[in-house]
Amino acid sequence: MRIDEGFLTPEAIARLQQEEALSDKTHKRTAQQIEAIYSSGQNILVSASAGSGKTFVMVERILDKILRGIPVDRLFISTFTVKAATELIERIEKKLHTAIAETQDYQLKAYLNDQLQALSQADIGTMDAFAQKLVHQHGYVLGISPHFRIIQDKAEQDILKREVFRQVFEDYMSQTDNKAFIQLVQNFSGRRKDSSAFREIVDSIYAFSQSTANPSSWLAEVFLRGSKTYTSFADIPDQAVDTLLACMQDTADQLRDLTDMEGYAQTTKAGKLTAKYTKHLKMIDSLYEWALHFDSLYGKARLGQLAQELTALLPSGADITVAGHKYPIFKSLQEQLVGFRHLETILAYQQESLPLLEVLQAFVISFSEAYLAAKMQENAFEFSDIAHFAIEILQQAPDIRQAYQGHYHEVMVDEYQDNNHMQERLLELLSNGHNRFMVGDIKQSIYRFRQADPQIFNQKFKDYQSNPEHGKLILLKENFRSQSEVLNVTNAVFSRLMDESLGEITYDDKHQLVAGSEAQKQLHPENRAQLLLYNTDQAQEGTEEASTNDGISAGEVTLVAKEIIRLYNEEKVAFEDITLLVSSRTRNDTIFQVFNQYGIPLVADGGQENYLKSVEVMVMLDTLRSINNPLNDYALVALMRSPMFSFDEDQLARISLQSSSQDQPQAFYDKLSNSLRGQGEHPGLIGQELMTKLVDFDRTLSDWRQFAKLHSLYELIWKVFNDRFYFDFVASQPKAEQAQANLYALAIRADQFEQSGYKGLSRFIGMIDKVLETQNDLADVEVERPKHAVNLMTIHKSKGLEFHYVFILNCDKRFAMADLQAPIILNRDEGIGIKYVANVKELLRDEKLASLKVTMETLPYQLNKQQLRLATLSEQMRLLYVAMTRAEKKVYLVGKASKEKIQAKTADNSSEGRLALASRERLLSFQDWLLAITATFSKEDLFIDVRFVDDSDLTAEAVGQLRSSGLLQADDLKDNRQTEDIARALDMLDKVSKLNASYQAAIELPTVRTPSQLKTLYEPLMDTDGVDIIDQPYHRPKSFDLPDFSKKKAVEPSQIGSSLHELMQRIPMSDQVTAGDIEQALQFVSADAEVKARIDIKKVTSFFATTELGQLLQEHHQCLHREAPFAMLKKDSLSQEQYVVRGIIDGYLLFEDRIVLFDYKTDHYQHSAELKQRYQQQMDLYAEALSQSYGIARIEKYLVLMGGSQLEVVRLDE
């Protein structure tokens, strides 16, 4: 290729596509990729599905431009992140090196070397970076010094912002006519007594405006648009009415389906329609009729009347119960009716809110101007300021704009679906109108919280699709990442979920994923997608699994651990090929705990700025706060409750009752001091154990406070670590390496704080508290990531990455919809909608009431809320798409649910192969969507298996263990700081172990033994003649088997034995024990039904009815002692040390001249002689204890044997 060779014509591109298709290349470029690489002369939008090779296309296109004589510095290339820009530059650099090596043309080599040198100076990076460069060069147009700095510390931003707010607020409050402003502040203050709630409102409006192309224009022209437009029923948009009517029809459809269910009683025994069925039929008919004939029956003007009639028609509750299951079919419609029901009243009072909104508009504009002025004075700006400056420069200076437009051959942008309107305006100004190249995928737009607007992409998609003269639309559908099992399930799910109404694009043939190679099309049935649900039916009430908690349960994580162990053991999958995806990087401790339990290495990509919220750092900060000021109740109690001192709730409650006076409240530290002196109101509550802990705590805290006066913060923190072993303690917890790094960093940051000239604990605490007050944090401490570990990251963090096996966890977590209840809701096109606090006193006509305040959702608020709800659900849908398309081989979706309820679930309504819009809007979790799809559509077409996992599947035995991967290596502790006390303790242990050898016999002798233990001890130590050979060592067998905590397991003989003993204890003894007495006693035995069923009641009855011993017990029941505890001293023959034997005797009859001792045994046996020999020593011990206690030498000993085929009572002293 010559440097000056022209760009390919459409005909040349078509020939190249044909040649590529006929070539024998292993990795062929698709026709669409070739078109995207070589097309030119107009704006181009590339809609690139997941895994379709968009980065490859961009790199090839850039290289083609360079090879055709376009220097790299004449290309504007925007990426979403700095990391993406770095990777793109590295790929271009590699391609250029390859091109240089392959060509023999010295002129081309020289040119390509020049491009390599120019690459570092080319405009390849984020929009923020380019805007800074432009303002540095041309900021003089706006009077901005080129020496400005960026305020990157959010804490600094917030401090400055608060100060500006305070000044503007005081200005408005000091005005003579401030009545409307005061009412405005009160409208948003709620129960707060300060202006903080109003400040949060202003902050949110300011932040939102900054994402627009022109903030001041948006505030002036759009901010009040909705409030001035939507003032009557006639102004309600058709879409809002259509949504209500669709919800009515969907409710009718669901109700009709429920009435057709098998468990629904349509008729009485006499064959007549039940009253419930008649009522429901009326509901169904009315809902259908009112929805279908809305225009003729009501129209917008009578929408309030429809809402009231619907309210009267529907039940007050949201559920209908069929066959014991509740179905919340009315919930969605009732939520829709809340606003419409009282809309006439709301519209009347809404007029009062407009003057307040005009004041709010003026205040936000004043604040924005004052905040910018303050930043100008500091010559320090935020990224958004710089971007707006860049836009303003290009708009105000045509010569500068034309220079950029003439310079750039092409304006390229990656991840176009995540652009906001400010960025879009900047790109428009840099382009000459027909040289834009935009790559993105609206299905992966997941940054709405950063004010990204996927509609920018969508509008261009539709425009280019309908009007090719405006630009070329290229679809990259082929996926080169995932196997067919992943592609098929993704297509099956989203073709039934995503459309223009919800998802903001219709998932049809244009967007469905297609396997890009033959290898991907090969079927692997073992990799079929799975929806794994932990069955909460068996979870005990009150447990995490049984609750409606959205958090990740231990059951969910255990089933994931089980599958990972299977993959590792059986399929030899490496840990690093497995990734867990979660919606949030917080509250994931359960995952670490369970993985720790099973030895599965796990590394979390935790993101940034979560440091001060880590538990170990919060504990240390509260420790420092307590040292600085022990009168800080919250910090002091947190310190006492922490693992350093471990005071429990009961102990803290006892201390809290030790006030010295009921008249004045006292700090918790004063109550602690009262407790120590015994001067509290209830000194009797402070026991000796608690007093000992209090003395230790008070002495330690006093020591720390004294130490803090004379030493640095660094030394103080390490003293706390050493005194209470806290640094060593966190090493035993989940995420130990990260926790220790955080604590070490706290000491380092405290040292840096003092090195910078600030001194003192008080100032350090003040600095930390100021950071926290502004809801900011410090950057997390990075630790070295293990190479071979399962990955844990958020879905947002995973975007652009790929993994062999993906587990999407916590699919049952409800979507975050808190923004729908906020005091204000902003819309880019309609402006603000608010909740207005109206005084409705005149409606009640009650002169006694001074005022009656009611919070109303104004019509603009309701309309914005509906738009926000759809936007939120659409983004959640795209999040699920991103998560599922990260998988190369297999995707697992994991959640928890009641199996019984899910199996009783009816199919949802569908339309044109998708779930009905009302159904999709009603469902509020990934799991809800997936289960609705599987219940509604043929399972064969969904390419996913739904499997419930019970507790019985998650026992330690069922989960299994990781296969051994060779010898374990010693931990590398060279970088850990070991406390001095630990070092001394290790030395002491080494010396003590040598001393122990000299007194081994006495050391190993237990202070207390039970008869059963002694029986086990005696058996190997006594020969047939009873000769003592106890000097031979006895080794107790050790077991390292994992305990089995499953619910369903086989009944153990020990359980039967324990339950039988309890039964014999509970039977009421009298002259005649009946079968009824025994059955009644069995009801009170604390055992499972399975265990009770194994007790042989016939043998128990026979014992009392047919045996001499049983008759004797009934005849002399007044002499009977049951479950009698005893204790006696014995001497060890080897060490000559005494020890205590303790035990419980099943029963004995106490007579004046003798004792009849008996014991129940359930051991299985063939000959009774076996058990006589086995239990002889144990019964002798019982007899010896009774003889010592009562001074009676004659002891008759009986074993009641119930483990054989027949009941037997044998006497041991015969």
UniProtKB/Swiss-Prot annotation:
Span of the signal peptide: none
List of residues binding ATP: 48-55
Enzymatic reactions: Couples ATP hydrolysis with the unwinding of duplex DNA by translocating in the 3'-5' direction; ATP + H2O = ADP + phosphate + H(+)
Cofactor(s) listed in the protein's UniProt record: Mg(2+)
Annotated GO CC locations: cytosol; DNA helicase complex
GO BP annotation list: double-strand break repair via homologous recombination
Annotated ranges, domain UvrD-like helicase ATP-binding: 27-483
Alphabetically ordered keywords of this record: ATP-binding, DNA damage, DNA repair, DNA-binding, Exonuclease, Helicase, Hydrolase, Isomerase, Nuclease, Nucleotide-binding
Pfam families per UniProt: PDDEXK_1, UvrD-helicase, UvrD_C
Gene3D superfamilies, A to Z: 3.90.320.10, P-loop containing nucleotide triphosphate hydrolases, PCRA, domain 4
EC number(s) recorded for this UniProt protein: 3.1.-.-, 5.6.2.4
Membrane-spanning ranges: none
Entry function: The heterodimer acts as both an ATP-dependent DNA helicase and an ATP-dependent, dual-direction single-stranded exonuclease. Recognizes the chi site generating a DNA molecule suitable for the initiation of homologous recombination. The AddA nuclease domain is required for chi fragment generation; this subunit has the helicase and 3' -> 5' nuclease activities.
Family listed: Belongs to the helicase family. AddA subfamily.
Complex formation: Heterodimer of AddA and AddB/RexB.
PANTHER family: ATP-DEPENDENT HELICASE_NUCLEASE SUBUNIT A, UVRD / RECB / PCRA DNA HELICASE FAMILY MEMBER
Protein's name in the database: ATP-dependent helicase/nuclease subunit A
Source organism per UniProt: Streptococcus equi subsp. zooepidemicus (strain H70)
